[in-house]
Amino acid sequence: MLGDLFTKPKKRKYATIPSDGTKADVPEGIMTKCPECKKIMYTKELQKNLMVCNYCGFHHPIGAKARIDMLVDEGSFEEIDANLTTANPLGFEDYMDRIEKDKQKSGLNEAILTGHATIGGNPLVIAVMDSRFRMASMGSVVGEKILRAVEDADKTNKPFVIFTASGGARMQEGMLSLMQMAKTSAAFKRFSNHGGLVITVMTHPTTGGVSASFASLGDYNFAEPGALIGFAGRRVIEQTVREELPEDFQTAEFLLKHGQLDDCISRLDLQNKLSFILSIHVKTPEVGGEADGE
């Protein structure tokens, strides 16, 4: 009995049974797991639902081209300023290598896609930011493309609609990126002074210099449900004000509740909503005066 206490236990032997190869081979990308409710669904079904979760309504991120395809009238989109590409004015190390990788990943030359289109037959100039490209940070080219798009809307007498999704100003361009905040805001103001209509739709995430400049300067300011919208990060604010912030702080729903948004609109309803707003703001030619030769 006592001897058993000092006896080494015998090691259990295990045998590895080879797989018979009958395990189902699931192609990559065929299923998508919702990060919010953790439910798994077919990717094709998710795409049919405009990348909105069928179970909880979570809005999955989408690229600029996909958003335009699901929003504007088929075949109506005509891109503008596609030739504008980023330089490296500060000589930031490996910046251009990162830009090239993002070009391949997103299929875009920059973090924003701009052009003319129609929604429900209503003409507009549209701009869509793409978070796959440098987290849609605003550098000199992004600012320039927004400026030119707004000026195009002004010249052609069309409304301007912009979808924002950004991590803020692009640090690799330093002061040049910060200048875009004033540049874009001034363009919005000039357009507004000329009677132009601006609609902003903030998507997840809209933060930093973009949220602090043009993102909230629309005549209508909308957001997708659950979008993170704010300037500084939650922890930075808590450490500054020395207070615990509400759980839903910096969400689209929180901003709507406190009067900083006009509406929080599901992606599934956005096309109809925009079509209606654009239709009631159509500018008609003035009757009489010089137009009639008087």
UniProtKB/Swiss-Prot annotation:
Residues 30-294 form the CoA carboxyltransferase N-terminal domain. Pathway: Lipid metabolism; malonyl-CoA biosynthesis; malonyl-CoA from acetyl-CoA: step 1/1. Keywords: ATP-binding, Cytoplasm, Fatty acid biosynthesis, Fatty acid metabolism, Lipid biosynthesis, Lipid metabolism, Metal-binding, Nucleotide-binding, Transferase, Zinc, Zinc-finger. GO terms for molecular function: acetyl-CoA carboxylase activity; ATP binding; carboxyl- or carbamoyltransferase activity; zinc ion binding. Binds 1 zinc ion per subunit. Its main location: cytoplasm. A zinc finger (C4-type) spans 34-56. It comes from the Bacteria. GO terms for biological process: fatty acid biosynthetic process; malonyl-CoA biosynthetic process. PROSITE patterns: COA_CT_NTER. Its EC number is 2.1.3.15. GO terms for cellular component: acetyl-CoA carboxylase complex. InterPro entries: AcCoA_carboxyl_beta, Acetyl_CoA_COase_Trfase_b_su, ClpP/crotonase-like_dom_sf, COA_CT_N, Znf-ACC. Disulfide bonds: none annotated. It is found in: Cytoplasm. Zn(2+) binds at residues 34, 37, 53, 56. Acetyl-CoA carboxylase is a heterohexamer composed of biotin carboxyl carrier protein (AccB), biotin carboxylase (AccC) and two subunits each of ACCase subunit alpha (AccA) and ACCase subunit beta (AccD). Component of the acetyl coenzyme A carboxylase (ACC) complex. Biotin carboxylase (BC) catalyzes the carboxylation of biotin on its carrier protein (BCCP) and then the CO(2) group is transferred by the transcarboxylase to acetyl-CoA to form malonyl-CoA. This is Acetyl-coenzyme A carboxylase carboxyl transferase subunit beta. The lineage of its organism: Bacteria, Bacillati, Bacillota, Bacilli, Bacillales.
